[in-house]
């Protein structure tokens, strides 16, 4: 089980995964196995900086930063 913050779409149906190649993938929140692949940081300030950088590079659209524990509780 992970702890920290992740990027999700506003509907909380997808999470952001950063690949080793630096690409961005979106995985469903329907299965808990996908949570282990999510990009997760414990510091929300760092997540905000990363969010701005990814938005500036047009790698992601509007996303929310949420505590991953909220998503674990959803399933």
Roles of regions detected by a PLM:
Residues 1-2, 36:
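Sequence-level motif detector for i,i+2 pairs with an aromatic at +2
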Residues 3-27:
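N-terminal acidic leader/helix
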Residues 10, 29-31, 48:
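Intrinsically disordered, low-complexity serine/threonine-rich segments
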Residues 34-75:
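Short, mixed-charge low-complexity intrinsically disordered segments
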Residues 16-20, 27-29, 41, 52-55:
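Short amphipathic beta-strand/extended segments with alternating polar/hydrophobic composition
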Residues 24-36:
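A short, surface-exposed interaction/processing loop segment used at functional sites
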């Amino acid at each position: 089980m992970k702890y920290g913050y992740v990027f999700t779409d506003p509907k909380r149906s997808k999470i952001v995964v950063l690949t080793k190649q630096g690409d961005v993938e979106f995985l469903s929140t329907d299965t808990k196995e996908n949570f282990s692949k999510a990009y997760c940081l414990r510091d929300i300030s760092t997540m905000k900086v990363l969010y701005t950088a990814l938005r500036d590079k047009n790698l992601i659209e509007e996303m929310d930063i949420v505590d991953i524990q909220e998503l674990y509780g959803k399933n």
